Design a protein with these regions (language model features):
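Hydrophobic beta-strand segments within beta-rich accessory/binding domains
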Residues: 18-20, 28-29, 94-96, 104-105, ...
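A common structural microfeature
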Residues: 15-17, 26, 35-37, 48-50, ...
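Extended intrinsically disordered, low-complexity coil regions enriched in Ser, Thr, Gly, Ala
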Residues: 31-38, 107-108
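Right-handed parallel beta-helix
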Residues: 95-134
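Short, surface-exposed interaction patches in beta-rich subdomains
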Residues: 4-9, 39-54, 58-78, 85, ...
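N-terminal segments that cap or nucleate solenoid repeat domains
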Residues: 1-32, 95, 99
Length: 256
């Protein structure tokens, strides 16, 4: 019932791909230095899910011998845990695939070219506390009944963002510095979605609802069927375009 160290060196590829495919667990991750691509610790109190690390020229996969995608065990000390740090030496693509897990990631300053997240249930928190030094082609998050909290999304430096999910709560904060034009698409079912945008960011939000509701706070002006911040009305700076398809839930728009 001990800890297993994790050490993954940078592969030969210029833009490598890191895939994390794990069962129900708790995972925290943050930025590190330049020495290693991935470093950290894996803790399995059951000794029943041995760690597997597959390293190839194009990237690496962190997974388990027999991943369990059920609920995170609530018993004291019963949940497997990952504590990871990502290097900042070279840009890379990141894929996360998991079941009913609790994820808490701060990827501020980590050079990411692409992120794909597929999670069944649980909780997923992602923060970009510092700007991404690389241009991110796509940020994609797909969930089942997972509660999602994404912070400082402008710092992710994405060109396109796609978020889809079922019955859960979504809090999306587009804080940070918007370095270029970006588009975000949100598609949810029976979900409460809160979208927050800095008042200084040029943002255009198009809401699409079936039986859902839209609550628009101060700082937005309706124009041509969309909700625009003052910088967007004035044509100042890069523009963040958000399409929010909230079919049966509620959408709240706020400026910060």
């Amino acid at each position: 019932m001990g800890d297993t160290p994790i050490h993954v060196a940078y592969p030969a590829a210029e833009d490598p791909h890191l895939r994390i495919a794990v069962g129900a667990c708790r995972l925290t991750a943050g930025p590190a230095g330049d020495a290693e691509w991935v470093a950290g610790t894996y803790h399995d109190p059951t000794d029943g899910r041995p760690l597997r690390i597959l390293e190839e020229e194009t990237g690496a996969t962190i997974t388990e011998e027999q991943p369990s995608f059920g609920r995170v065990r609530a018993a004291l000390g019963g949940a497997t845990r990952y504590e990871l740090e990502f290097g900042k030496k070279r840009p890379f693509a990141l894929t996360i695939e998991t079941g009913a897990s609790d994820f808490d990631l701060d990827l501020g300053g980590v050079p990411l070219s692409r992120i794909a997240v597929r999670q069944g249930a649980g909780k997923f928190e992602l923060d970009f506390s510092q700007p991404n030094p690389a241009r991110m082609e796509l940020l994609e998050v797909s969930t089942g009944a997972a509660a999602i909290e994404l912070e400082n999304l402008a710092n992710a430096n994405f060109s396109e963002m796609r978020l889809s999910g079922g019955a859960a709560g979504y809090e999306l904060d587009f804080g940070g510095t918007l370095a270029h034009d970006a588009e975000a698409s949100i598609e949810t079912g029976v979900t409460a979605v809160t979208v927050s945008v800095p008042a200084s960011t040029a943002a255009r939000v198009a809401a699409e609802t079936t039986l859902g509701s839209v609550d628009v706070g101060d700082g937005f002006t309706t124009k041509e069927g969309a909700f625009l911040t003052e910088p967007a009305l004035s044509g100042v700076g890069p523009v963040l375009k958000i399409r929010a398809g909230v079919r049966l839930g509620s959408l709240q728009l706020r400026t910060t």
